[in-house]
């Protein structure tokens, strides 16, 4: 089709990448082609099988972006109109367990890819950053970044993502940066520390749901379908930073656990664990994290459609 828009999704076999792929194929107003490059470290091969129905419009390349030869990457990328860079090590528990590996990987990706994006000149890149950069807040795009204490390795992840943001801003290719706040939904793995899939998996199996600390930490969850819908809209803007999340239903983690048990009809019990029992000495938690969404709303009209109950039901 002459007017096909071709998208390259780096890390596209992951949780957000899969939903983004589906949302692109579901677009009514444009024909799309999607190519995914992913090393499948935090996703499974089945993630790519479901797009077989799109035949030659979907292509999956299993490769490690940090070691892929430059010319090979450029040759692939030049066939695409827009790039989503979602690749990277994720998850607070993953970062806590493998601090050096997650840091090196995220910085290696930046060092490798950003000069290549620069060579592509006019290809728009949307980079997935993180709400971790705000530390304890405030959570507005114009506020200062405020990562936590430098003695706690947890904040290395935020620092690597922030460094990547600066490297992108220092370049001359068109970009959009998004900071995701607690995006959740079907297909998300709990293995890396994402709280909702961990709770849902436990409830499904009538196992204990483990709440860390007092359970009074406050979070606000965004359905992945809302997140990828606005992510696509934002890929048509340039030079800006946006929060993506849902601020309508902040909830304490202990109440979230009770909600999951109630909605699932599970016989699970809720147990508590101290941070010391659960994590390394490098772990630090954020008490409250709720996004400021005024900027993304003003730019796109974004208002999340899915409630927290919707998210949990879709995951059950």
Model-derived regions, located:
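A short helix->loop->beta-strand "cap" motif at the edges of active sites that frequently abuts
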Residues: 31, 120-124
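Helix N-cap/beta-alpha junction loops of NAD(P)-dependent oxidoreductase domains
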Residues: 45, 91-93, 136-137, 186
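SDR active-site strand-loop-helix element
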Residues: 10, 37, 83-87, 125-131, ...
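Conserved short acidic donor-positioning loop in nucleotide-sugar-dependent glycosyltransferases
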Residues: 39-40, 131, 247-248
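N-terminal Rossmann/SDR dinucleotide-binding element
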Residues: 2-79
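Catalytic helix-loop patch of NAD(P)-dependent Rossmann-fold dehydrogenases
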Residues: 97-100, 104, 108-115, 124, ...
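NAD(P)H-binding glycine-rich loop region in Rossmannoid oxidoreductase-like domains
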Residues: 65-105
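C-terminal substrate-binding subdomain of Rossmann-fold SDR/epimerase-dehydratase oxidoreductases
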Residues: 23, 182, 203-316
